[in-house]
């Protein structure tokens, strides 16, 4: 089954926040993405609200509930108490936990699962008790022991950090090596019964090879490249192009 496409709206929100104006409207572009066949929406509400604002979350939750009940809402973030309360209020289908420092421009590494196992176990239990699926951001470095530790936290999935693979857009041999490591990490998770998501710097060009190497890839969340392409092709056509890259459309 092809990977589901979840459209990350942070870049849309960042553009909106350049002015004290309500456009571009994050909810409107979320609706366009879902109308074009995206299966979910992803947001990463950072503490300083420089991209998605906390006030966006109930609007996006209502959009999905009222108009696209089969779609999923995925909220990413570092599991601070404030973040966990946001998730408990918004009730996303999935929470993706990332080890970000608040000052980071973007997520750029996975969890050190050995160092944070106890902390993550408690957080995962809390979120799952509230009815949410939990995914943990993981380095795609082929470390099977790290994946086993992630499994031990009780998490349902890992999200492969695909940034190193995405950065090899002009270096095919290096891209092949990174893809092999991602595949090994995914295989380890799959063997343990975990679901596998992917995200970061995925594009129309590099997504097909990832989907071919990891045929059980459950979901990809894509924002930067998708938003950039939408400037040229429009949101609806861009979503269709990414769905084709996932193998969903012929």
UniProtKB/Swiss-Prot annotation:
Keywords: Cytoplasm, Pyridoxine biosynthesis, Transferase. It is an enzyme of class 2 (transferase). Belongs to the PNP synthase family. InterPro entries: Aldolase_TIM, PyrdxlP_synth_PdxJ, Pyridoxine-5'_phos_synth. This is Pyridoxine 5'-phosphate synthase. CDD domains: PNPsynthase. It is found in: Cytoplasm. The record marks 159 as: Transition state stabilizer. It comes from Allorhizobium ampelinum (strain ATCC BAA-846 / DSM 112012 / S4). 3-amino-2-oxopropyl phosphate binds at residues 8, 19, 201, 223-224. Homooctamer; tetramer of dimers.
